[in-house]
Amino acid sequence: MCIRDSVNSFYKPFFFRHVETFLDSPQPVAEYIPLKHFLHRFTRSIFWELEDMIPFSNHPLYRCLWGWLGAPEVSLLKLVQGPVIRRSSVYAHVVQESIMPIRRLPEGIRKFDDWFGAYPLLVFPVRIFNRGEHSGMLKPRPEECEPPNRTSGLWVDLGAYGVPRDVKQGQVWDAKSSVRAMEHWTRDAGGFQALYTDIFCTPLELREMFDFTLMDAARKRLGGDDAFPEVYDKVRSEDGISDLSVELAAEKAAGKTVDGKKGK
């Protein structure tokens, strides 16, 4: 029997906690989830991070009395954080996603355990289409697309959210080296990083991950170079979060530039 379950109602348990109950269920259970509730199944709990902010947020009393308020707006939380608290949170907390070809998922899970050790992990399938020169910033490698036409391929979004294992064990977690290792592996695997997260790559490294051909052409045609910031300037972490002076100096010494221009 399939029952209807509006999992995103404010008084309901968080979706990931609801899913956990099925692990102990002796019988198979089928549910029908309305589309809007399914698409927003992680919204109320900010995936599973709200319990780190408000430990009792999944308590029935809290859900019934204050659940209708919804989750705090993350952008506003960042806005009111001072630079010291903001930097401390980055180096004691992980929010990262790597979108990799699905065949690399087993390796990605093992590496996420090495880099972050934060659980549970989010796993989302993503289909990426190969439109050739019109693909935009997400230009998949043809060998990762499905034969015979190679018009699209299946990637998977692997996400880690929470407190890294090293931090829980009272050790120092090197956020910069861990995230940069993830970024390097993602680029080599033909994947992409979610740019809402704290990035630790240089402008050149970002361009190696994403295809800026159409973006650069549009900026040049419309005169946007002098009017609007680069993509990197819009998504990079604030000053004081990461020091990339060594990496930028190494790129400069090696003569590496961004499309023939001096690296930023």
Residue spans for each PLM region:
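Noncatalytic alpha-helical scaffold of FAD-dependent oxidoreductases
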Residues: 4-264
